Amino acid sequence: MLFGLIRVALGAIIFLFSFLLIQRSRICHKRTWIVSAFIITIALAAASAFIPVEDTFVTFSSAEKAYHYNHSGSVMLEVRGKKTSFLVGKRGNAYEYAIIPKVEHGWKLGLGVDIEQVGQIASDGVFIQVYKHKKSEECFIVVQAVQGGMADISDMQNSEFLYLEEQNRALNNSFYTYYAYIGNLNDEYALTVNGVRITPCQA
């Protein structure tokens, strides 16, 4: 994950430069200055994770490449929207989500601060979450069939629901999670899961 490595490397360079500058100077209380320089370096590195400078001049050729720049998981699924893509990554046994914004000539970094969960509901054997990309206002829905087996899912927008399957040998069952792009969401949005109508943003 280059995102983290670059910040560690730049932080080390900045601190080393500050350390040498302080050691060669004639100021008093050098130890205090060195500790202060270390704290400031850590703060700058942390701030750069929320406001990455490279996002202004680095463009990626695919959403997956943008994902791998600041995520270490393997991409399992990509759900494409008009201005963004929703990527499902897996790191170990855990899944992680990222929304990658699209620009004219490629893709930019997907940052956690740009994602908002705008809906969540557990109903009739399913767990539903709705995520919005703040800048584009595009939304994606995640539907987990918690009781196992495939689900019959449709919505009022005729969205295409893609899915990932997770097999549980201990329970001798397969569990499915469904993903779809649903555009700019409003409170009237509804989907039907196994014949049950659900409005995730009114719950």
Predicted regions and their residues:
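Structural motif
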Residues: 142-149
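Membrane-embedded alpha-helical segments of integral membrane proteins
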Residues: 1-22
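Ser/Thr-rich low-complexity repeats and stalk/linker segments
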Residues: 152-203
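Membrane-interface helix-boundary motifs at transmembrane edges
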Residues: 23-34
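N-terminal export/targeting and maturation segments
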Residues: 43-119
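Short amphipathic beta-strand and strand-loop transition segments with alternating hydrophobic
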Residues: 73-78, 127-132, 165-168
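Transmembrane alpha-helical segments of multi-pass membrane proteins
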Residues: 32-45
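Extracellular ectodomain segments of secreted/surface proteins
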Residues: 115-142
